[in-house]
Amino acid sequence: MSLSERQKEEINRAIAEYMQNNGYSESFSVFLKESSLSENDIKPLGGILEKKWTTVLRLQRKVNDLESKLQESQREINHGAPTRDKRQAADWIPRPPETQKLTGHRLPITRVIFHPLWTIMASCSEDATIKVWDYETGQLERTLKGHTDAVNDIAIDAAGKQLVSCSSDLSIKLWDFGQTYDCLKSLKGHEHTVSSVTFLPTGDFVLSASRDHTIKQWDISTGYCVYTFRGHNDWVRMIRISNDGTLFASASLDQTVTVWSFATKSAKLVLRDHEHAVECVEWAPDTAYTNVTGQQPEGNSTHILFSGSRDRSIKAWNINTGDVLFTLLAHENWVRGLAFHPKGKYLISVADDKTLRVWELSAQRCMKAIEAHEHFVSTVAFHQTSPFVITGSVDMSCKVWECR
């Protein structure tokens, strides 16, 4: 395939601009002479040669991904397994191999999250940084620096415009997300490592949990702590807010899960059935209620909470009664993260046994186990509208898994 004269001229101009901008003065002069260009012909092209090179690399990655997916689909067809086209969206689950392996962090990954609107995700690490990635191409978009110790948790508000992070440096930071990526504010008040953070649904408050045994509510506009929740007697590992925004749950090393009311600013329930520290909690989406309970929801009775523990178990709780609905057992080490399929049929869990497991909630069984990483798997997230799951590990990598 030959190039037209116009295409040749465009390529020559792009090469000349690259040489000129990168200090290849002698080569630049020779190239102008041999290509019959003059310096007047070299107009600013905005680094088009580098952009085209980057585009080629991205396209090559996508070609490789498509080839992998084609091979996987062919294997499924050969073995009689249903292809993605034959499955309903509610039945799509993560399947190996991963579509992307993201490397760049220098210490273990502590949290991964999806942006609610764009095809990007964020990861944070014990290396004190937050990284922003395009999860479809695997491209690192940006690194946020500002913390001076491990970043333990991150969250993005519902509008996708702000990110909040918390750290072992005792601070919480608010970041612009999408425009400048600048740190907008630092919130200080905890007396020990800040381990978990999340936005309230309204977006004007942030909730944080700490190794100082407390949970704090912060006003974003002022940066001040407006309330401190006390009740745990050990490190609070994770906090999660209910889907309707009326309650939140906290998991602690004191082996309990506490459910708190925003209205009364007090504990509604203390859940005690785990035999070791509780690492994670996650509220089941309303779509999961029937799969979890076998009943149709009545009124506001859809508060179902799941917890994962160092005792290797996952428990489902009825928050109206405080009872354990059932316990899921299959992991061989600490359970570190939970995420629900948006359609409510499956629960995804990750653990220090290096696996990602898919649980069918209606049958209360582990239907699939994936050897996800080479070391402990510390975090997992399920995209709410696209068929992707991401995991992060102590092996310093994040992986993107397509659901099909």
Curated annotation (Swiss-Prot):
Q: Which Pfam families match?
A: LisH_PAC1, WD40
Q: Provide the coiled-coil residue spans.
A: 54-81
What PANTHER family does UniProt report for this protein, alphabetically? Answer: PHOSPHOLIPASE A-2-ACTIVATING PROTEIN
User: What processes does the entry annotate via GO biological process terms?
Assistant: brain morphogenesis; cell division; chiasma assembly; embryo development ending in birth or egg hatching; engulfment of apoptotic cell; establishment of mitotic spindle orientation; germ cell development; locomotion
Q: What is known of its domains?
A: Dimerization mediated by the LisH domain may be required to activate dynein.
Question: Out of the domains of life, which is the source?
Answer: Eukaryota
Q: Where in the cell is it found?
A: Cytoplasm, Cytoskeleton; Cytoplasm, Cytoskeleton, Microtubule organizing center, Centrosome; Chromosome, Centromere, Kinetochore; Nucleus envelope
Q: What does this protein do?
A: Positively regulates the activity of the minus-end directed microtubule motor protein dynein. May enhance dynein-mediated microtubule sliding by targeting dynein to the microtubule plus end. Required for several dynein- and microtubule-dependent processes such as nuclear migration during cell division. Part of a complex with nud-2, which is recruited to the nuclear envelope by unc-83, where, in turn, it recruits dynein to the nuclear surface and regulates nuclear migration in hypodermal precursor cells. Plays a role in GABAergic synaptic vesicle localization in the ventral nerve cord.
Q: Name one GO cellular component term.
A: axon cytoplasm
Region entry Disordered, spans: 69-90
Hey, which family's this protein in?
Answer: Belongs to the WD repeat LIS1/nudF family.
Please list the residue ranges covered by the WD repeats: 104-145, 146-185, 189-228, 231-270, 273-327, 330-369, 372-404
Q: Name one GO molecular function term.
A: microtubule plus-end binding
Write out the transmembrane intervals.
Answer: none
Q: Which organism is it from?
A: Caenorhabditis elegans
SUPFAM superfamilies in the record: Lissencephaly-1 protein (Lis-1, PAF-AH alpha) N-terminal domain, WD40 repeat-like
Q: Compositional bias of type Basic and acidic residues: which residue ranges?
A: 69-89
Write the protein's name.
Answer: Lissencephaly-1 homolog
- Print the keywords alphabetically: Cell cycle, Cell division, Centromere, Chromosome, Coiled coil, Cytoplasm, Cytoskeleton, Developmental protein, Differentiation, Kinetochore, Microtubule, Mitosis, Neurogenesis, Nucleus, Oogenesis, Repeat, Transport, WD repeat
**UniProt subunit comment:** Component of a dynein-regulating complex composed of at least lis-1 and nud-2. Interacts with nud-2; the interaction is direct.
Q: Which residues form the LisH domain?
A: 7-39
Annotated tissue distribution: Expressed in all classes of neurons in the ventral cord. Expressed in the multinucleate spermathecal valves and adult seam cells.
